[in-house]
């Protein structure tokens, strides 16, 4: 899910929700000789008496979603000597995880994440995947809206706009200004929720009218439970480093000025302003392009049923594949599946790590794509006769179920036929788990009913339903204590001797598609460092 309309710097990524294969097949132990501790080797052979095949490799990446694919790409492009022989295994018959792009009758829509922030790491992945010419960027001047008191109100895109927008009262703006300068209650000395941090630093209006809907758009979460440190760490660090949000901002600016500037890759595009990106044929182009480059290293319909530690070092992973049972022996393993899936797979290795990972929560979210004729848009919502903007967010206090709406056909070109408007709507989340009991028709009705309150003319014809995708376990919630849970899981694996077994994915790196890519580069560095040490053992 991705509705980061207030600042296009965080987009969320719907995680995979395939159920863990809790039935761990027990096979008779087999004595296998494998050059796991030596130089990089790869090969396959029949397992004598086992009726299957064994493969030896440097690194196995479990999960062919965007995190797993990007880790493989990062290793191949940035650390080619670390794990020259690697494989990416995916239980489904396609790559991409929750990136699902559909195209039909002149419409092109997303049923998972909708876009990404074009940061340099993201653009590096785009260029290395051969997609530079397919990149499309939204208009950085396009407005974003928040529903308040029955009206869609624009959100300021820069500080100089603050005095002039009507989403907040004069008193609310003054309270936010003083708080940002440090004239506010002191920190409580414990981990704060997003709600606690924002109300203390910026006041009630900023929280209720800006941050609460922002949390719904990014995490589909409850800001009274989300951790400020874990969910919005960059803002949290401003107060930590500078004594206040403004103080931290100036300090960060000064540090950037004094820091040595690395030369920017000349291959990368130069986006103008703060915007979001996609591709000519939708987000699916990225996982498909990476998979094509990896070729036979990507294994589809490979279901991991068990993982054990080898006495000689490394790991043995047992897979059920279309070609039968396969045993993979690898020096390192990266788990990029959702935390609840990883928990089931890792329980035989570490009860403590599995218990920690099982605590993470993923609420349900539905992505509802519908279309209206252009004339269905209310006149007061048009700019120069057109629906313009990124989209709109809906605070939970405003009497609508829908978390927010992306103006898909306004954001990127060629998303809808002439005369039609394409809207991607998200509904559900931590505060509305009841969507799981609703049919597709009921979800469309709920979204349509909400839109007629502020965007669509009440007497317009029924919308054209394009797609309804329900994600029962959608977005990992970075709740208070999230980092403690991750630390427990990682330290439990390390203390039990499971070196070279890494945790990755959006519950580790962050829910934004861009953060998954940045996290992939970070994980690739970890694997490279481990493999460098491994070579000298």
From Swiss-Prot:
Gene3D superfamilies: FAD/NAD(P)-binding domain (3.50.50.60), protoporphyrinogen ix oxidase, domain 3 (1.10.3110.10), Protoporphyrinogen oxidase, mitochondrial, domain 2 (3.90.660.20). Residues 1-34 form a transit peptide. InterPro entries: Amino_oxidase, FAD/NAD-bd_sf, Protoporphyrinogen_oxidase, Zeta_carotene_desat/Oxidored. It catalyses: protoporphyrinogen IX + 3 O2 = protoporphyrin IX + 3 H2O2. It comes from the Eukaryota. The keyword Cytoplasm does not apply. Inhibited by acifluorfen. Its EC number is 1.3.3.4. Belongs to the protoporphyrinogen/coproporphyrinogen oxidase family. Protoporphyrinogen oxidase subfamily. Catalyzes the 6-electron oxidation of protoporphyrinogen-IX to form protoporphyrin-IX. This is Protoporphyrinogen oxidase 1, chloroplastic. It comes from Arabidopsis thaliana (Mouse-ear cress).
